[in-house]
Amino acid sequence: MSMKDNIITIDGPSASGKGSLARNIAAHLNFDILDSGLLYRVYAYLYDCGLEHSKIVSHIKKDIFFKTDLNGLTIQDGKEDITGDLRSEKTAKAASKISSLKETRSNLLELQRGFYSSKGLVADGRDMGTVVFPNAKLKIFLIASPEVRAKRRYLELQNRGQEVNMLALIDDIKQRDLKDQTRVLSPLIPAEDSVVIDSSEMSLDEVLSFTKKLTKRKLNK
């Protein structure tokens, strides 16, 4: 893969703010966006519905539709809206588990790379800068303390009307971190040429402002 001047990768642990940053930077630059975590959730959802590994990617290409409007992003399996199922903690845990399998990661690799277009791409996930787009021009590794990330997730789930326990969220995040960082395939580590941003004491606006300066310097955009 050649050096891509218009690919930005944003990696980091669960609830570090990758998605919010990716959406804002993509809108700022008018780039396409790849939410790889959402793809893994779709994969896990379809697997739990009984589809075999060998059939999931073709099903995603043919029957999964991503729609964005004033109300945000919705995902449909055919005509069925599965957005709520994908955003649940149950699917999040299933995605975390299935993402450690070689077959899953291999199946999704080319699908993820297929999101690239000459328009430009912001890709967020856990191995975007190390595995999927290793030659991206700008790589960001976004982190925050488990406590800060748990608070963000707590507020997010509360806004969806879900009952959550803060201590349980902190423990869950720490366990996911350990699993992501120690897995054999595509462990959660910053790329050697990535810029590490600790957002523990930063607002989204502050992280966004800093990232815009990086894009100006690295991509001249």
Outline where the language-model segments fall.
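Residue-level signal for inorganic ion chemistry
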Residues: 37, 79, 108, 122, ...
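Walker A/P-loop
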Residues: 19
